[in-house]
């Protein structure tokens, strides 16, 4: 792991905001990109600090990156946990469909494959292309979306929201922001728990022959930097203070 120190510093310098991945199933990103990016930074995001207490973050720096982007696709599995702070905190799945049979036979199976990874926090945005003056298209879009909700929402969690390409309303944006923040918060909680467990495991080795400060440093600073990027500054400073203390005692 010591070999990753230089790489860690390089990655850290280029990771000044959290990543929201975009899974563009129906080639819609160019149609909605400007509208989505106007929602950034994420406003009034309620996150949990290290003590699991809610903290309101007024402005959370974030960027949308497509899953086909080389910045995501080039990452190796063995690096994922070391540099977990730079992995996407949410995945927005963009879809559209204008036919119920097509939804059942093509789109639904494809979506099932995409979202079956339980490690990833995701939600689906159904983009309706129906013009308000076209009653038939509008009714079909509503039917397809209702089927989407029935198949992917659960009693515990709603995973779908509907974007009207000809003029999304405030209700959609409130729903979109809420689902995005839920994903970010859940991802952050999981990663904090992982880093804490790993750091605890390494701390137990401090006074043994296998102790390696470099390993501990990368994991501890990764946690500190993740707090820093998500604007949980008190937690970040606390991690850096603990890291400095550990170094002075090594």
Locate each region found by the language model.
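Eukaryotic intrinsically disordered, low-complexity segments enriched for acidic and Ser/Thr/Pro residues
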Residues: 1-214, 218, 250
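TPR-repeat structural position
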Residues: 233-234
């Amino acid at each position: 792991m010591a070999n990753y120190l230089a790489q860690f510093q390089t990655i850290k310098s280029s990771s000044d905001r959290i990543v929201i991945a975009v899974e563009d199933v129906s080639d819609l990103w160019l149609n909605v990109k400007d509208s989505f990016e106007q929602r950034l930074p994420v406003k009034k995001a309620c996150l949990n600090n290290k003590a699991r207490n809610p903290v309101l973050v007024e402005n959370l720096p974030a960027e949308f990156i497509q899953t086909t982007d080389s910045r995501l696709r080039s990452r190796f599995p063995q690096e994922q946990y070391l540099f977990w702070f730079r992995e996407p905190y949410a995945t927005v799945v963009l879809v559209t469909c204008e036919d119920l049979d097509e939804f059942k036979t093509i789109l639904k199976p494809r979506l099932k494959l995409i979202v079956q990874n339980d490690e990833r926090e995701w939600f689906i945005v159904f983009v309706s292309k129906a013009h308000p003056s076209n009653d038939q298209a509008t009714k079909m879009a509503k039917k397809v979306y209702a089927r989407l909700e029935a198949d992917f929402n659960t009693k515990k969690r709603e995973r779908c929201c509907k974007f009207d390409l000809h003029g999304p309303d405030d209700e959609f944006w409130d729903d979109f922001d809420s689902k995005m923040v839920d994903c970010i918060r859940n991802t952050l909680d999981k990663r904090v728990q992982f880093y804490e467990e790993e750091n605890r495991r390494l701390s137990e080795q401090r006074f043994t022959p296998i102790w390696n400060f470099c390993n501990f440093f990368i994991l501890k600073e990764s946690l500190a930097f993740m707090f820093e990027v998500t604007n949980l500054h008190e937690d970040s400073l606390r991690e850096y203070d603990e890291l400095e203390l550990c170094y002075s005692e090594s």
